[in-house]
Structures are given as structure tokens and as C-alpha cells.
Amino acid sequence: MGSLAMKPVPNKWIVTFPYGVTYKGTRKKHKGVDYSCPKGTSVNSAVSGKVVFAGWHKVGRGWGRSYGQHIIIDNDRFKDGSAGLWAGYCHLSKINVKVGERVNAGDQIGEVGSTGNSTGSHLHFEIQSGRLWKGWAGSRNPQRWIDA
């Protein structure tokens, strides 16, 4: 069986901080996967869908300030038929899409950076379910779809 979503960065870049791991021994779990890549590395949409956010939240929680410049895409449907999932691409140096724009899986949507709460250039890729941000309860392991 092939993957259900595309990897958001070129294949030579691997996950350097996996889903679910605690950060420095804290109880706060990592809600996505991090790919350590140089600034400017192409970020491609893992799924087809509609851009529902593209920019930098100034205030708030969730997909907020800690993610720096980021994009949220509401997927049409994953190949397994599941719906109600959206993908977040965070810490970007450049955003190439606008809210309301439709993208296809594989389209370049931005470039890797180190904006927001970041200690170095990388892409934080996150999947959330439902229509509202639910923190850990709404997060899903992105590797489930990429490695399927």
C-alpha cells in the first residue's frame, strides 16, 4: 500500500523530533514531527485542500505565536477516505499561498525557516482533527499517513 499523504519536504530530510515525545522531560508532548532542513528548503503540501490560514498569529493559543509563520490546509480527503483533518506547516521563512487558495498535494506552499518558538531551521508538520484546535487531544501522528 502506498502512502496516504506526501512528505512535505524532499525525501533526503528525515524526522529529527518525532510525534509524541516529551520536550526536555516536561509533560508537554510534541504534537507533530520536525524535519531539520536548511532555511529556504521547499515545503510542499502533503495533501490537497483549501488554505484556511497563511501568516503569523499575533496572539492566541494553538496554531498561534509559537508556530511563527505558518500555513494551515483543510484537506479535501485523504486517500483512506477520512475527512475533517487539517495539516499545519510551521516556522516558515516564506509563504507562497493565500487564504482561500486551493492547493494540490505536492504544490510548493512555502519555505523552511526558524520563525516563532524555534531553536533552528526546521519544518514542524502537524495534523489536527475536527474543526477546532484541540491541543494534544486533536493531534494525530503525521507519520501515520506518510508512511502508510
What are these regions (language model features)?
Residues 45-96, 121-129:
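Zn2+-dependent peptidoglycan hydrolase active-site motif and core
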Residues 42-54, 97-112:
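Short, well-structured beta-strand-loop connectors
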